[in-house]
Amino acid sequence: MATRYASLDRGQCEAELGKRHIAYERVGEARGVIAPLRLKGAIAGIDFHSMLPPAQRRTSPYEIYDCRLVLALDDWARVLARYDVVEVVHYSVYRPPPAKQVLNGAGRRHSGALAIDAAIFKTRDGQTMSVEKDFHGRIGSKPCGTNAASTVGLPAQAVTLRKIVCEAAEAQLFNVMLTPDYNWPHRNHFHLEVTAGARWVLVR
């Protein structure tokens, strides 16, 4: 699915948002972002937002998403709902490029608002799952698929976090999915990315 979304232009993507009844505000321009927007509510019942206080989120550039990432998050929301997740707190989506940096085309990953660093998951009953504290990753281990690391003996929240990632990977909701098993910089979040032009899925 991520491959299909990555090929959409702004008009096609926004038309799909309309079909899905996703509330958003169009952003006129955000450097490096093809289809910038701000969310105006939950996506399929799940609230995605940064760690900023609510009053700051309304104008912060860190709350800008590319439309194509939002479509992928809408699909992922169906997976999250199976585990009673109602809120996802991220460390980063859009990282504006420096003003003096010359851009050659659209940005990628965070510079194009096409990636989210999901860090904290809150459930309907008030529980919180932190990737940093609850995933229990091991660098070099395989989180999903054939030869994935065993979950025997892991706490329930660690198992749930793996299911959240691996079910998304199986459905190919994102092109790139990096977990704490990948390296130290990803110890505290899941990096989930829609990659323009990609016809592959990488899960580490």
Which residue ranges define each predicted feature?
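Catalytic cores and adjacent binding grooves of peptidoglycan-active enzymes
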Residues: L37, D74, G107, G112-R204
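An acidic- and aromatic-residue-enriched active-site/binding cleft used to recognize and process polar
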Residues: V85-V93, D134-H136, G197
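Active-site acidic/histidine clusters and adjacent loop/turn architecture
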Residues: R4-H90
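Short, solvent-exposed polar/charged micro-motifs at secondary-structure junctions
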Residues: I34-R38, P96-V102, N188-H191
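Mid-length scaffold segments of soluble, non-membrane domains
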Residues: P61-H90, P96-T128
